[in-house]
Amino acid sequence: MAELLLGVNIDHIATLRNARGTDYPDPVQAAFIAEQAGADGITVHLREDRRHITDRDVRILRQTLHTRMNLEMAVTEEMLAIAVETRPHFCCLVPEKRQEVTTEGGLDVAGQRDKMRDACARLAAAGIQVSLFIDADEAQINAAAEVGAPFIEIHTGCYANAETDAEQAKELARIASAATLAARLGLKVNAGHGLTYHNVKAIAALPEMHELNIGHAIIGRAVMTGLKEAVAEMKRLMLEARG
C-alpha cells in the first residue's frame, strides 16, 4: 500500500484575515506551521472573486513552501495564465460558482472533453501536474483518463454529509469503486471535501488513495488546539487507518 499524503488547505486562514480587511492571520505563516506539523503539501483555492486566497498569497507561497503547492482553480483563461506564470507543483481544476459557499460538486469532464484536454495539455507543458476534481462517477473517471490528467480528486462531500450510517456506507462503496476504476486506468487518486476527524479513517483506509486534501476541519480544530496540533492529529488518524 502506497504512502498516504496530507494536503492542508489554508483557505480559511485567509477567510479570517479578510473578514476584517487586515494583514493577519497570514496564510503564508500558517503554511509554514502546517509543514512543520507534518503536512505533505499546501492547498489553496484562488477563486475568481478572491474571497479568501489572493494573488499575493499564491505568489509568496510558491516562493516559500518547503513541500508542494496545490493550486485549486476554475478552468478559465485568467486562472490558466496565473498557473502557467506561477508554476505550482500541482493544479486541481474545479467547478466554480460565484454564489456558492464552497465547491458544491465535481467537474463535468465528460461534457467538456475538449476544454479539459486543452487545459491539461497547457498546464502539463508548464511542468504542472494536473488533477481533476470529480464525483465518484464512472463516466467522469473514464473522461478524466481520456483528457490526459494524471490525477483525479474524488469529491467526498456526499460521503461526508450522509445523514445515516447506511447512506454513508453506500457513498463509501461508491468512492471505493471509483478509486479502483481510476487506478486500473492508470490514474492516481486523491480525495477531499468535507473530511473531518470523525470520518477520515474510512477514506484513508482505501488502498488506492494517494493524498487527502483537508482544510475546514483542520482550521476549525486549530482555533481550539492550535494549528500545529490540529495538523498532526489529522495526519496521525490517516496513518492509523493505513495500519
Curated annotation (Swiss-Prot):
GO MF: pyridoxine 5'-phosphate synthase activity
Keyword Glycoprotein recorded: no
Residue(s) at site: Transition state stabilizer: E153
Reaction(s) catalysed by this chain's protein: 3-amino-2-oxopropyl phosphate + 1-deoxy-D-xylulose 5-phosphate = pyridoxine 5'-phosphate + phosphate + 2 H2O + H(+)
InterPro entries in UniProt: Aldolase_TIM, PyrdxlP_synth_PdxJ, Pyridoxine-5'_phos_synth
Binding, 3-amino-2-oxopropyl phosphate: N9, R20, G194, G215, H216
Active site: H45, E72, H193
Gene Ontology, cellular component aspect: cytosol
EC number: 2.6.99.2
Biological pathway: Cofactor biosynthesis; pyridoxine 5'-phosphate biosynthesis; pyridoxine 5'-phosphate from D-erythrose 4-phosphate: step 5/5
Primary role: Catalyzes the complicated ring closure reaction between the two acyclic compounds 1-deoxy-D-xylulose-5-phosphate (DXP) and 3-amino-2-oxopropyl phosphate (1-amino-acetone-3-phosphate or AAP) to form pyridoxine 5'-phosphate (PNP) and inorganic phosphate.
Family: Belongs to the PNP synthase family.
Quaternary structure, from the entry: Homooctamer; tetramer of dimers.
UniProt protein name: Pyridoxine 5'-phosphate synthase
Originating species: Salmonella paratyphi A (strain ATCC 9150 / SARB42)
